Amino acid sequence: MAHIELNNDLPGIRGLMAYRPETAEPLNALAEMLLRNEDNTLSRGDRELIGTYVSYLNECFFCQSVHGAMAGHYLACDAQQINDIKQDFKNAPLSDKM
């Protein structure tokens, strides 16, 4: 994953948000809409699982950990199950939509 010198010690996306607060507000609004809006055909757990997998592909440990924890909560599965999905999502027991 590419790295930008942010001049702060905040982990993950929190550092980016603090670096450019003027862009943080619309980005946070977008994230809230994508991940938590109830008018969606994917469950919150499925959306967090997508965030987990994308963050895994981007090699962002912070983001995949946060999204993975939320996906585990919503989908009632443990960290090992989330890790198994990241390693081999094509053979994971996921919904047809996923």
Residue spans for each PLM region:
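Hydrophobic alpha-helical segments
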Residues: 1-98
